[in-house]
Amino acid sequence: MNNQSFKNSLSLKVILKQRKRNRLLLIFLCFFIVVIAISLIMYAMRNMVSFFRTPSEITKEDILIGRPLRLGGFVEKGTVEYIGKMKVTFFVTDNAKHKKVVFIGILPDLFREGQGVVVEGYFDKQGLFVGKRVLAKHDETYMSKETADHLNKHHTVEK
């Protein structure tokens, strides 16, 4: 009988080890599936993410890729040009560099030269920023503190 209890004890230990191994395998598998799912979601959304950049922060890759992004800074004085009723061109500057923007649509009421602006759009093949949406700003709500400090160091916002 002693031999029988030893066998039962041994088989119980084997069963417990198998369960523990299976549990660890299940936890690892769940973790792996979650990591893969998050990676796929991030990969699928990479073109939908709209980054905020000042003209100085724009890279050649931003221009070549033509991905959606946000261009922020101030509307450069003397650059707003209306072409027809709905088309307007202007330069967005951070006082170090500037980028030309082409926008077709109705501008917000707060839009004016010297005022802060964020333009959502993309760069076309000629390097012009094609705006799809213009957000005129009356403060630094749309930008990080570092970006606002950089812009305000060289520019006084008109109120």
Curated annotation (Swiss-Prot):
Q: InterPro entries of this UniProt entry?
A: CcmE, CcmE-like_sf, NA-bd_OB-fold
Membrane topology designation: Single-pass type II membrane protein
Any idea which UniProt keywords this protein has?
Cell inner membrane, Cell membrane, Cytochrome c-type biogenesis, Heme, Iron, Membrane, Metal-binding, Signal-anchor, Transmembrane, Transmembrane helix
The family database entries (Pfam families) matched by this protein are listed as: CcmE
**Which SUPFAM superfamilies does the protein's record reference?**
Heme chaperone CcmE (SSF82093)
Q: Give TM segment ranges.
A: 24-44
Q: Which GO terms describe its molecular function?
A: heme binding; metal ion binding
> Highest taxon of the source?
Bacteria
Q: Where does the chain bind heme?
A: 138, 142
Described by its record, this protein's role is as follows:
Heme chaperone required for the biogenesis of c-type cytochromes. Transiently binds heme delivered by CcmC and transfers the heme to apo-cytochromes in a process facilitated by CcmF and CcmH.
The entry's family comment says: Belongs to the CcmE/CycJ family.
PANTHER family, alphabetized: CYTOCHROME C-TYPE BIOGENESIS PROTEIN CCME HOMOLOG, MITOCHONDRIAL (PTHR34128:SF2)
Q: Identify this protein by name.
A: Cytochrome c-type biogenesis protein CcmE
UniProt source species: Bartonella quintana (strain Toulouse)
